[in-house]
Amino acid sequence: YAQSGLLAEVHPSADFKAKLSDIGWEATKYNGKQIAYPIAVESLSLIYNKDLVPEAPKTWEEIEKLDKDLKAKGKNAIMWNLAEPYFTWPIISSQGAYAFKVTANGYDAKDIGVNNEAAQKGLQFVVDLVKKKVINADTDYSVAEASFNKGETAMTINGPWAWANIEKSGINYGVAVLPTL
């Protein structure tokens, strides 16, 4: 629509722009022009069962150690939806991968950073977690959600849309930033 000239530039006031995140405003620009208002910004996070993990781990090394301890009790440290790249993207991009290169004029859709060395390093980290049996390669959303909500898994990577089901399940949970690599 923007390329065809079907969208008009919008001019929000400075006061209004200050109420929303810069990343939301940047995501709604085209060729340096503000063509939309950001309506939602969500983020994935580490959701953890406080009864199994009193404090969220800060590193993946902690998660690997925790997984060994929990597996001895018939539980898992972490599961998340590996069927959809969205849920693994924070790990892949943590090494410098990007969907589109950010330029002074916004995003360059011709410069895709999902097959660069940084993306490969991030993805290799996930592959290594599978090889170490910390995670299962065939885990999808429903498997990860059910396991966490039954108290069988200590942590999951998910977003705010998952909180209602977690609350219905009675899990005593916390939300934290994802661990560093």
Positions of PLM-derived features:
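Extracytoplasmic/secreted proteins, especially bacterial periplasmic and envelope-associated proteins
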Residues: 5, 48, 58, 62-65, ...
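Glycine-centered hinge/linker elements that transmit conformational signals in sensory
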Residues: 66-67, 108-138
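Extracytoplasmic/periplasmic substrate-binding proteins
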Residues: 124-181
